[in-house]
Amino acid sequence: TADGELTLLVRDQSRPNGIALSPDETVLYVANSDADNKVWMAYDLDDSGASNGRVFFDINDQDAPGAADGMKVDRAGHLFATGPGGVWVISPDGVHLGTIMMPEVTANVAWGDDGRTLYMTSSTSLYRIKLTTEGIIPGP
């Protein structure tokens, strides 16, 4: 709240972890890192809080190492989410567009200052890749 009071928004996850906002900040994505329930959730946001919690994308059928973890969005609203095998690219409509395959379990991602370089942390290393899409870089 405006006076600094903590507000509980949802309590329906077993291991919430990474979070990201849609470009218009009306959807909050949350990675559930529970090995028994590997999903990315989506919640609608408005002045009253979060509602309409739903599974945005389910990766429980994936055998590659890794769980739903850190994520970012690009200006088009695509989610770049670390998960089994690497970084999953998912459209705003929940369609898996592809995966940036990684040699190690990937934990988190960040956009570089050019907005087109995606940095990725993994088990023991740091990687980067140049993309054609433009990421959302937090401003002052």
Q: Where are the regions that the model predicts?
A:
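Glycine- and Gly-Pro-enriched alpha-helical subdomains that act as flexible
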Residues: 20-53
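Beta-rich, blade/repeat-based domains predominating
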Residues: 6-30, 59-84, 103-116
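Short, well-ordered secondary-structure micro-motifs
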Residues: 40-43, 66-69, 83, 92-93
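Short loop/turn segments immediately following beta-strands, especially the blade-tip
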Residues: 42-49, 130-138
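Blade-edge beta-strand/turn elements of extracellular beta-propeller
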Residues: 1-15, 44-64, 88-102
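A short, acidic, flexible beta-alpha connecting loop/helix-capping segment that sits on the rim
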Residues: 104-106, 115, 122-127, 132-135
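Structural signal for beta-propeller blades
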Residues: 36-40, 87-88, 126-128
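Short loop/turn segments immediately following the C-termini of beta-strands
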Residues: 33-35, 84, 123, 131
